[in-house]
């Protein structure tokens, strides 16, 4: 399967490295990039079962959907996963987590946040993320955000000066985010506005023109898209809170994407950005 996906007859040899790392008791973490019709279904089950043999030195594996950009000329015709298919993959992963946890004290196999959003399901409780070991692969980011936001809001409300602050806060802000997390961010904006009636929050979903509209995560929003799309709102907002923008240096081989840092965006929009 690996040889087929990478169009390289030697690609399967790389799996031997896992054996060597396991034999040397070297701690590992892995990721499965799931491609519809290629390595999902029975192939995904087999891959998960094969990787579980490297426990306990393989500490975690994330399962993420392949990102499908608009730059796919002459490439395999990948498709996006449907709501039902995302639910099936979540079920497949969660059905194995209990077994792993009982034997090793780790949930081991983790579905990325994107699966839960696509399937319209609630995110797992915090304990299931094993200390957010796969956070940088998009696993548990939303649960961590929910936890931190809720704790911070409750802390503010319990402050003796809250009632005075509630009356004094008069501000309009815009939160820019990717389309994937738009609904979730909107729900938290509503909670903030309930806590502070004088606070007006506009949540703006940035369309990804650079990579294509099928890329909806916040981490791949480029500066050029953010600047172009948010300018029309700047007359209504004094300050914009930018959730996350891409840094050109994070791309393979330092390929640029006309990105700007947060201060550069502020100069373009003629407003402060954080």
What are these model-predicted stretches?
Residues 80, 87-177, 195:
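Hard-cation-handling environments
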Residues 8-9, 47, 76-81, 85, ...:
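Short secondary-structure boundary/capping segments
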Residues 158-234:
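Redox- and metal-dependent alpha/beta enzyme cores, enriched for Fe-S-associated oxidoreductases
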Residues 74-79, 123-130, 214-224:
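Short, surface-exposed amphipathic charged segments that create phosphate/polyanion-binding patches used
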Residues 214-266:
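A short, acidic, amphipathic alpha-helical segment used as a generic capping/interface helix at domain edges
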Residues 1-11:
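Hydrophobic, small-residue-rich alpha-helical packing segments that form membrane-like cores
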Residues 16-75, 84-114:
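Conserved C-terminal portion of the radical SAM core fold
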Residues 170-182, 235, 243, 250-253, ...:
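Short hydrophobic beta-strand segments
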């Amino acid at each position: 399967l690996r040889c087929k996906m990478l169009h390289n007859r030697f690609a399967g040899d790389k799996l031997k490295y896992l054996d060597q790392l396991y034999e040397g008791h070297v701690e590992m973490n892995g990721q499965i990039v799931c491609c519809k019709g290629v390595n999902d279904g029975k192939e995904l089950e087999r891959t998960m079962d094969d990787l579980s043999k490297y426990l306990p030195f393989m500490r975690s594996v994330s399962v993420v959907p392949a990102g499908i950009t608009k730059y796919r000329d002459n490439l395999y015709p990948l498709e996006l996963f449907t709501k039902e298919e995302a639910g099936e993959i979540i079920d497949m992963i969660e059905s194995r987590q209990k077994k792993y946890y009982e034997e090793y004290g780790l949930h081991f196999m983790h579905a990325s946040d994107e699966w839960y959003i696509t399937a319209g399901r609630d995110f797992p409780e915090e304990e299931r993320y094993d200390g957010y070991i796969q956070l940088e692969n998009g696993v548990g980011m939303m649960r961590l955000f929910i936890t931190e936001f809720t704790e911070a809001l409750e802390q503010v409300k319990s402050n003796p000066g809250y009632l005075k602050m509630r009356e004094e806060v008069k501000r309009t802000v815009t939160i820019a985010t990717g389309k994937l997390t738009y609904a979730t961010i909107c729900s938290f904006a509503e909670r903030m506005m309930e806590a502070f009636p004088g606070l007006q929050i506009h949540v703006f979903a940035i369309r990804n023109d650079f990579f294509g509209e099928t890329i909806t995560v916040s981490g791949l929003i480029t500066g050029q898209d953010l600047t172009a799309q948010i300018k029309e709102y700047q007359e209504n907002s004094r300050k914009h809170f930018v959730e996350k923008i891409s840094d050109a240096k994070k791309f393979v081989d330092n390929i640029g994407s006309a990105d700007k840092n947060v201060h550069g965006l502020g100069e373009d929009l003629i407003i402060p950005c954080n």
